[in-house]
Structure formats: structure tokens, C-alpha cells
């Protein structure tokens, strides 16, 4: 009779195969009930800030070590922001500055060009930043910031510059929410909210990053599309001729009507409402929307922009857009909005499974 015994190598391979099969089945089981949520939008619309808020509200938040580790990013954001202002000033104005201010500008530009990680400010750097910030020509340039690409958060950090310059400086949670690190590729986080696990994906919003979205589109439960509504008079970083809000509206139309998202909940965050309200005091949305004949009233302008987005939905008879007007750095407001979104997504899932 032939032997039915297996070799030791065969037994070991079978054991390994069994472990792999069990892990695959476990992963598949873990997928059941999970909600897949995409954060989409153009660059610098606030996607990463929303994900940080979700982490603060529904996960482990940020430890003291986490906060210490982003101090270099705060310093870098300030240096890069000031360098952007200096370059724009030189482009817009050709006024003769004092030798001291010229030296300050050259010092900051050299730091911005350095490949080294940003370090705590030495007295020369700190004093250069403050002198430049208070220079009238720099302030005139800052007032024209819609004409060039600049981080929204520079004003916040400049208002906190003395605290940030403290030798014992540790960034606060508010600082963490405002730092700018461009999302390259895809960032995934698994967070349990109200007993349901959400796999949340934050994907790069720059044009060059959008091609990386495609593999995420299968089995999406909900998409949060974020648009910074204060950008109606600003140019795109990747294309100085393209309006940022026009780009956002165009991308939303593509996402909203994509075959990939027919079954997914479509949630729209009209973000940066605080900056939008402030900008309306000096600049009408008519600069982009020539057919808008209303006033600069905040509520009226928000309603108009909301309509411009929502009317792009070609499946309005079967698909609703859930719109929220947000300020991503306002933790209390974002908590209410995220709770509402989670309840809606869970409710849709229960109805879809016949369990509600």
C-alpha cells in the first residue's frame, strides 16, 4: 500500500497555508460592518484638519510626544509663509527698504531654501520675522494674498509668535490643527465611532495626487467632499491661471456623478466659513459668479454657493446631498457635524440591510 504520510516540509507548508487562509477569512470578516469613508477635495481645503478632529473626538487624540514632534512643522510653516510674502512683495512692489529689512528678508529666504528641518528660532530669526511682519509693505502684500498662494494659517501663527518662540514651546492641539503638511498619496485611519468601525481615507487633493484615488472607490459607504468657500477669488497652486473654487466645483461635479458613488452617501462640507465671512467684508463672490446679483450678506452668499454645488447632482431624484457649512478648526462644531454624518451613514447601512 502506498504511504499516506506527509513529509515534514509538506506539513509545515500546510500549517503556513492554514494560517494564511485563517488570516484572509479574518480580514474578510472584519470588513463586514465596517464603513468606508473617503475625504475628497482639492488641495488645502481642510481634509487633513477634519481627519485630525475625528482623531481628537473619537480616537486616541494626540499625546504630549505627538505635539512635541510637530514643533518643527510649526517653525517651518512660519518660515515658508514669511518667505512667500517676501517673494510676493518683491514682485508687487519695488520700494527701497532699509538695509536692516533687506538683511532680514535674505535671512528668511535662506532658511526657507534650506533642506534642513526647521529648528527653534534663534534671536536673529525671531526678530527678523517680527520686523518683516510689521513692515507696511509686507502688510500691503498680505492684503493682496488672494493673488498668490499662501497658507491660511500664517496669521494665526503670527498672533502666537511670542508663545511659539518660548524655549520650552510645546505645540497645543490648536497649533496641531493649523499646521500645514501637504497630503501625499493616501492616509488611512480606522476609528470606531458609536460602535461602528470607520475606515477613513484622506487623499491628496493636488491634481498630481488625484490619480491615486481610483483604487479606493470600491465599496464606499460615504464620501465627504470638502470645499474651501473662502477661495472664490484665489488661484490654484498647481495652475496660476485656474480659480480655486471653480476647480473645486468642477471636481465635485465629477465625483458626485461618478458611477463609483451611485450607492454612496454624498456629504458636502462648505469649509472655512470663518475666513469666508471675513473676506465678504471686502470682496463680493461676484468676482467669480458673475450672475450673482445679491448682497455680501453671509447667509445669502452661502446659500447661493450651496445651490451652485447641489444643482450639479444629476441623480437628485435618487441621491441626496447632505450639506454642512463648517469651520474645520472649530472642534465643538465639527463634533456636532461628524455625529450627524455618522448617524446618517449608520442609518443608511441599517436600512440597506433591513435591520432598521
UniProtKB/Swiss-Prot annotation:
Residues 175-183 are annotated as: G2 motif. Residues 33-356 form the G-alpha domain. It holds the Pfam family G-alpha. GO terms for cellular component: cytoplasm; heterotrimeric G-protein complex; non-motile cilium. Transmembrane segments: none annotated. Residues 198-207 are annotated as: G3 motif. Residues 326-331 are annotated as: G5 motif. GO terms for molecular function: G protein-coupled receptor binding; G-protein beta/gamma-subunit complex binding; GTP binding; GTPase activity; metal ion binding. A lipid is attached at residue 2 (N-myristoyl glycine). This is Guanine nucleotide-binding protein alpha-15 subunit. It comes from Caenorhabditis briggsae.
